[in-house]
Curated annotation (Swiss-Prot):
Main location: cytoplasm
HAMAP family hit by this protein: MurD
Catalytic class of the enzyme: ligase
Gene: murD
Protein's UniProt name: UDP-N-acetylmuramoylalanine--D-glutamate ligase
Domain of life: Bacteria
Binding site for ATP: G119, S120, N121, G122, K123, T124, T125
Reactions the enzyme catalyzes: UDP-N-acetyl-alpha-D-muramoyl-L-alanine + D-glutamate + ATP = UDP-N-acetyl-alpha-D-muramoyl-L-alanyl-D-glutamate + ADP + phosphate + H(+)
Function: Cell wall formation. Catalyzes the addition of glutamate to the nucleotide precursor UDP-N-acetylmuramoyl-L-alanine (UMA).
Subcellular location: Cytoplasm
Any one GO MF annotation of this record: UDP-N-acetylmuramoylalanine-D-glutamate ligase activity
Record GO biological process: cell division; cell wall organization; peptidoglycan biosynthetic process; regulation of cell shape
Length: 449
């Protein structure tokens, strides 16, 4: 292990728990560090902290006392959701204490190759696609990272034959130093998490940290459909392999409805197991990674054809009386909803949209709304979504929440229609996260059956 000497007998502060914090604390303890865990949730309501204390790890809960950092910590490992303007983080940085996320630990604790996937949309689907295709091609792959499996836990179980396929957020990448994937994928870049990063440029810079330790023997896979992503191609030492649905590139591309890798036919686009132009892009990125790692064409084709998608990401839920239901609750921005709509005949679609009001106008979405059968709108942003619907000349129905919206959409649907939850907004005005929102949609579908 590369990091035993870094942490053994050193004091390390783990700031914030959740899955990644617990994983980091346990790994550091195992490696001989003197670990302190600090979490804002009160101890009596914090079963994870209770479990760590039972196992001999020091825990301080209920607040984040700045005086804690008067101790001689050699390292802070923070939860990626904790911002860099947090007073604890600011004090640590001011004292010269390195601030990592558990992704850095994962890299240092294992010698297996890493495929890292980042971007604004499509990360989870592409990460899952890549892992499934690699496994189908007898290249053992382990999913980890932002997809829900802490990288530092999974890395400890990896064998020499494995590849870690790691979904990476900008928050996670900001807390890395030596992290060095063999292949990095950038799915796309749109303005996201500006409240965290401050500017789009800072957001892109955080994403681009994925490649800063890479060399010419490594590969960066970039979406050449996007100007913002394409511009990064000249800013890396790694070998760039592009993908595109708009032009023939020296990588993976779409031409005449077929997918190719450097001139080699892989499969027809309509064979991909999930709909939408965005999933063609996700498949092309997957094809690049698979070919770079030696997976044959047949395994790629069979795996992508069988791919069933990921929960809350244009997930086909089922049919009731000939009406199809799709759960795309993960679509928390305009681009994601545009991509979702691109896979369907608008005249058959009843779109459920709306959510947290971030002040966005939805003019960019108007061309994609034209021709929709109807829209069901809800949430804080409903008035803004209504204005976009008016411009697209689409009739709307207002709903109180997702359950109400789902029932109202089904009530007006006819055989052959599609009820699509693709909100184009975050969920936090009504729901804790997009997963909870999507689960309400799924539960209502079951009740309607």
């Amino acid at each position: 292990m590369k990091m035993i000497d870094i942490v053994k007998n050193k004091k390390v502060l783990v700031l914030g728990l959740a899955k990644s914090g617990e994983s980091a604390a346990r790994l550091l303890d195992k490696l001989g560090a003197i670990v302190t865990v600090n979490d804002g949730k009160p101890f009596e309501e914090n079963p994870t902290a209770q479990s760590l204390l039972e196992d001999g790890i020091r825990v301080i809960c209920g607040s984040h006392p700045l005086e804690l950092l008067d101790e001689d910590f050699a390292l802070m490992v923070k939860n990626p959701g904790i911002r860099y303007d947090n007073p604890m983080v600011e004090k640590a940085i001011g004292k010269g204490i390195p601030v990592w996320t558990e992704v850095e630990l994962a890299y240092l604790v294992s010698d297996v190759p890493i495929v890292g996937i980042t971007g604004s949309n499509g990360k989870t689907t592409t990460t899952t696609m890549i892992a499934e295709v690699l496994n189908a091609g007898k290249k053992p792959a382990k999913l980890c990272g932002n997809i829900g499996y802490p990288a530092s836990s999974v890395a400890q179980t990896a064998t020499a034959e494995d590849t870690l396929v790691m979904e990476l957020s900008s928050f996670q990448l900001m807390g890395t130093e030596s992290f060095h994937p063999h292949i990095a994928v950038v799915t796309n870049l749109i303005a996201s998490h500006i409240d965290y990063h401050g500017t789009f440029e800072d957001y892109v810079a955080a994403k681009w940290m994925i490649q800063r330790q890479m060399t010419a023997e490594d590969f960066v896979v970039i979406n050449f459909n996007q100007k913002e992503a394409k511009e990064l191609a000249g800013q890396t030492k790694a070998t760039v392999v592009p993908f595109s649905t708009q032009e023939v590139v020296d990588g993976a591309y779409l031409a005449d409805g077929k997918l190719y890798f450097k001139g080699e036919y892989i499969m027809d686009a309509d064979q991909i197991g999930v709909p939408g132009s965005h999933n063609v892009e996700n498949a092309l990125a997957t094809i690049v990674v698979a070919k770079l790692l030696g997976v044959d064409q047949q395994a790629i084709q069979e795996s992508l054809s069988a791919f069933g998608g990921v929960k809350h990401r244009l997930q086909f839920v089922g049919e009731i009386n000939g009406v199809s239901f799709y759960n795309d609750s993960k679509s928390t921005n305009i681009l994601a909803t545009q991509k979702a709509l691109s896979g369907f005949d608008n005249s058959k679609v009843i779109l459920i949209a709306g959510g947290l009001d971030r002040g966005n106008e939805f003019d960019e979405l108007v061309p994609d709304l034209v021709g929709l059968k109807k829209m069901v709108i809800l949430g804080q942003s409903a008035p803004r979504v209504q204005r976009a619907a008016d411009k697209a000349e689409v009739e709307t129905i207002e709903a109180l929440d997702i359950a109400d919206a789902t029932r109202k959409a089904f009530a007006i649907a006819e055989k052959g229609d599609i009820v699509l939850l693709s909100p184009a907004n975050a969920s936090w005005d009504m729901y804790a996260n997009f997963e909870v929102r999507g689960d309400v949609f799924l539960q209502t579908f079951e009740e309607l059956k």
